[in-house]
Amino acid sequence: MTQVQASKHDAFPWDQRTQQQTQGVDGMAGTSKSARVFTKGWGESPWSIDFRPLPRLLPEQVDFAVVGGGFTGLAAAAWVRKLAPEKSVGVFEAEQIGAGASGNTGGMVLGESSAGDLPGLGDVLGGFRGTLDELGIECDLQLPGAWEIGRKEGWKDSPISWSDSGRLRVVDEVAGGTADAGKLVSGLARAADRSGASIHEGAAIDDLQFDEVRGQNPLVLKMGSKEIRAGSALIATNAQSLELGGLQKRATPKLTLAVATEPLTPAQIEVLGLDSGKPFYTVDFPYLWGRTLATRGVIFGSGLVDVDDWRELKQIDIGSGRAAELMARLELRVRNLDPVLQSVGFTHWWGGPILIARDWKPIFRHHVRSDRVIVLGAYAGQGVALSVYLGRWAAEAMLGLRALPDWK
């Protein structure tokens, strides 16, 4: 997960909230000693996706089309086939599965949306874990809880005590934990593939055509000169291809940044207060989130790169420009949190796309032009558990088994 929520109790205006999240921290001592080594573009996360679907011909027609091969789309595809194995399901991914937010997250698992609890949302963590169990997915899920940390009114016996524009301490503990995002993407894709859904990589859907005169299959997915007819569709592209879901004026895409440290010793982990395995995120600004890894490295994340258009996301190189500046500031912040991190090395630097709606709520609704199309996304960086949970809900809604929520 790439957490960007300030607090479930806060109600920051849109402009103030995003501005404060993208600001760096001034006045920090020291200079960065890391020699950043990463591929151009978004860099490289610690996760490995070890499943690739076999190439296959594009179908002429499917009962259910899923646009987007991340957590949401893959979970929905697998669940539709589980409940209705007689229905054909096609997943159409513009690049490779997990190429967007799902493969570039921090892997933090929380039970609420970035807007807090929502009417009728239900037990996200229980539903997430239950879905993984039913689909046979192993992703190193651990749910020990999560630390909310802040600079005011922290616990006197806080296990965390870091220096970061004040003294960062634990202020609360909430339900949550961590997962291996690469294993989660791979597991969902395997489950969908095993169930009989067809997964097509490099299949960018350019447009949707709503033509009611076509009778049984009024919906047409356009991919260049290729047309794919569908009975229903789920648009799960999150921060990309916003026009498909009609979201270009309803939500804003950004690139969030993170680093992973080299493996630390158990003693260093204990000094940092992270030996419980609980992930953490701040409830005030400047924002910071993170978690430990199986390698005993630690992920730290902060900073948002703004774009005017979602197409600009792929043009970002975290080794240059604004992204590189924010990445350098993040490294310095990490090194100044505690003396045990002063000379720490980094193994990974990366960015991941997120989509933030203006009310910070997930977008989960019918397309404005057709109730045969569901649009789902905009988790504001808090989508690891939520995307799978709501992907399952979307599958049930497409089958007519469940109504969509009213989160307007």
Residue locations for each model-derived region?
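Flavin-dependent oxidoreductases
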Residues: A75, L208-L293
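Glycine-rich FAD pyrophosphate-binding loop
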Residues: L83-N104
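N-terminal Rossmann-like FAD-binding beta1-loop-alpha1 element of flavoenzymes
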Residues: F64-G90
